[in-house]
């Protein structure tokens, strides 16, 4: 997982200009961030490590500094296959979070998928010979849609090994790339 400080920056006004790039350390007690999204006057942070979960940092007094950091939801997962990217929904009203297959599903308010995960195999299972992800069963990695307050979570897609990020096309269709192996 990634360690380090959260930073914010202002890029020069145009490529090749002499404008100054300004970078400042943010005073938020967060590490191991794998996903960042600024939306709804808040910085949302997907933490993949100690304290894994979805966090929200806000400036509540208008001084241009984050003075409130709230853990919206704990997520049971960490490491290279834990919580990852955050994206704004195509309609701009909610957040999508991507979690790898070592992140257990959280409690969902609703789901677009059947909840009766099946491990029915025609042939005997062949676990990874190197031992990776042995015992990790369906639904695998998953993608959820979350309201800005972090209260309502809808499972929208699952079955991934370790998708790190997603995006949407102009029609609002979701695209994911299943990383590794």
Positions of PLM-derived features:
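Beta-propeller domains with acidic blade repeats across secreted/periplasmic ectodomains
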Residues: 1-181
């Amino acid at each position: 997982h990634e360690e380090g400080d959260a930073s914010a920056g202002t890029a020069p006004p145009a490529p090749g200009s002499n404008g100054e790039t300004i970078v400042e350390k943010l005073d938020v007690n967060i590490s191991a961030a794998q996903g960042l999204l600024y939306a709804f006057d808040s910085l949302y942070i997907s933490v993949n490590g100690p304290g894994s979960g979805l966090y929200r940092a806000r400036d509540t007094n208008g001084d241009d500094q984050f003075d409130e950091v709230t853990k919206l939801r704990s997520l049971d997962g960490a490491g290279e296959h834990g919580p990852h990217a955050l994206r704004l929904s195509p309609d701009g009203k909610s957040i999508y979070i991507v979690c790898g297959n070592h992140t257990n599903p959280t409690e969902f308010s609703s789901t677009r998928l059947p909840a009766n995960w099946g491990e029915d195999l025609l042939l005997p299972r062949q676990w990874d010979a190197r031992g990776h992800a042995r015992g990790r069963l369906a639904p695998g990695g998953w993608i959820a849609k979350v309201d800005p307050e972090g209260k309502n979570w809808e499972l929208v897609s699952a079955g991934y090994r370790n998708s790190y990020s997603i995006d949407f096309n102009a029609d609002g269709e979701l695209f994911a790339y299943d990383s590794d192996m």
